[in-house]
């Protein structure tokens, strides 16, 4: 199952929910939310912020959450050259402010 389903199921609030539906993708879930077939959707925050930025006033992101997750980048263990290039690119993006601009665009709460 998805991490969202697992996180919701672990939360005591899930006992107050009439039904928890699983979807194969976020687009289908958000379409059902838009048409009123759902009351709420649980998605990764970055996904939710992306959709709310594209549909201003149509969706609302709650400040509550069901926990946090960490993500990583997987590389072949022996690909030291790619690792060095990736590290250098990330360091450069942090140094020149590009990383902060990306974070501001995609991860911060939209103005309401």
What positions do the PLM features span?
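Structural recognition of the beta-strand scaffold that forms the well-ordered cores
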Residues: 21-22, 40-43, 62-63
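Phosphate- and divalent-cation-binding pockets in alpha/beta enzyme and binding domains
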Residues: 6-7, 32, 50-51, 85, ...
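Surface-exposed patches in mature extracellular/periplasmic domains of secreted proteins
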Residues: 20, 63, 101-105
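Bilobed "Venus flytrap"/periplasmic-binding protein-like clamshell domains
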Residues: 1-25, 45-49
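Short helices/loops that flank or line small-molecule/ion binding pockets
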Residues: 10-11, 26-42, 46, 54
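Periplasmic-binding protein-like
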Residues: 27, 45-112
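Short helix-initiation/N-cap motifs at beta->coil->alpha
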Residues: 20-31, 69
